[in-house]
Amino acid sequence: MDKRTLFSKLPSVDKILGNDGVIELEKEYPRSLIVEVIREQIELARKRILELNESDMEGFDIDEDILINDIGHQLKLKYALKLKRLINATGVVVHTNLGRSPMAEEIKEDLWLIASRYSNLEYDIESGKRGSRYSHLEEIVRKITGAEDVLVVNNNAAAVMLVLGTMAQGKEVITSRGELVEIGGSFRIPSVMEQSGAKLVEVGTTNKTYASDYEAAITENTGALLKVHTSNFRVVGFTNTPELEELREIGDKYDIPVIEDLGSGVFIDLSKYGLSYEPTVMDSLRKGADIVTFSGDKILGGPQAGIIVGKKKYIDKMKKNQLTRALRVDKFIICALEATMRYYIEEEIAIKKIPTLRMLTYKLDEIKEKAQRLNEMIGRLGIPAEVKIEVGHSQVGGGLLPLERIESRVISIVPENMSVSRLEESLRLCDDHIIGRVYDEKYVIDVRTLFDEEYEIICNQLKSILG
């Protein structure tokens, strides 16, 4: 059989469209997309024929059933959402690459109701007049934090930029050289400050800064004192950093506002659950910060948002800033954040309902029980692999507690019929996208970050891949 004969056997687009299998596909996919994929598959087959040498042509044929099957597979890939749910088996609780914090299961009904119907986003039901989208969060945030007012924008970098742009545009903002952090993706506090229109004044050194350094740098053009919580790194050894109360005293003396950027931000004292102490939002407000900014989608366990709390007189000005409209959040964020905040009224409920907090506060016995359960389920599969429970260490992630290693339990897998790297790739690329770790020539699943329903999914994929 020569190439000309093979080319002649390629079906036309119209012929494929008339195939019963393709007619069924039209019930699921737009016809224009089907035609596009058919043309791509025909062109792909044509290229394969062109690349054939004489010895290959004898065994090569055009199988229309295989072509239709390939068309269906490609349609599924093209039409699927690019943002996919996956399984986090890494043990990093707030994994910034894997969607950060998972939200509470129970809020999905609230979200769906707001998303699929009209809402009072900017409508005051009591008066029948235009309302403010920010009013929905004011009461709950005040109740939890004790702040006078709140404003929510789309992320914490935006929150910092809005705060500085409102309170200190064209003025100097004093901050410690040791707190000029990079928050990820090459976004740095000095760059955010420059974009806001404020002028950075660095004081102190990388490892030591004193309150007197701040005071010595004050001029008639000083707009604010800024403290940045270095949540994503630690300077240890010969160090000093002024306490927030000290900056408050200086702020009062010179009538200068004090701003603290907490970065991740927490509402609960994590040291009660065996983790290192992290300043809470409430701590910062009690110690005298006029304005505190933090994230909604890290330890807090809500959607991506930059939350600004503090003195009403400053937040009122921010609400009037033209930049606020460009940075504002939509009804989904407001709904998800309000629903998440409700759990924080009672700490025990927050720990139980918010996945991030639940994962971080598991007792070791609970972790051991989770590992034993998964180990037994995998053991019943009879797969050709060495599988066992080992001691491992989880991480908080999200730029918080970078030195914290939380004792955990992992399932280590060493397959007999393929390499560990091949197993990692197969699990990552499977339909359920299981993301684990390769450590010490073993594939490792940390049970801390697994949801109960994911155990069976993992077992099914291991059985499919390893046989």
UniProtKB/Swiss-Prot annotation:
Subcellular location: Cytoplasm
Pfam families: Se-cys_synth_N, SelA
InterPro entries reported for this sequence: PyrdxlP-dep_Trfase, PyrdxlP-dep_Trfase_major, SelA-like, SelA_trans, SelA_trans_N_dom
Its job: Converts seryl-tRNA(Sec) to selenocysteinyl-tRNA(Sec) required for selenoprotein biosynthesis.
Protein name, as recorded: L-seryl-tRNA(Sec) selenium transferase
Enzyme class: transferase
Annotated family: Belongs to the SelA family.
Cofactor(s) for this UniProt protein: pyridoxal 5'-phosphate
Keywords noted in UniProt: Cytoplasm, Protein biosynthesis, Pyridoxal phosphate, Selenium, Transferase
Predominant cellular place of this UniProt entry's protein: cytoplasm
Gene Ontology process terms (BP): conversion of seryl-tRNAsec to selenocys-tRNAsec; selenocysteine incorporation
Pathway(s) it belongs to: Aminoacyl-tRNA biosynthesis; selenocysteinyl-tRNA(Sec) biosynthesis; selenocysteinyl-tRNA(Sec) from L-seryl-tRNA(Sec) (bacterial route): step 1/1
Encoding gene, per UniProt annotation: selA
Catalytic activity: L-seryl-tRNA(Sec) + selenophosphate + H(+) = L-selenocysteinyl-tRNA(Sec) + phosphate
Organism superkingdom: Bacteria
Molecular functions (GO terms): L-seryl-tRNA(Sec) selenium transferase activity
Gene Ontology annotations for the cellular component aspect, listed alphabetically: cytoplasm
EC number: 2.9.1.1
Coiled coil: none
Chain positions with N6-(pyridoxal phosphate)lysine modification: K298
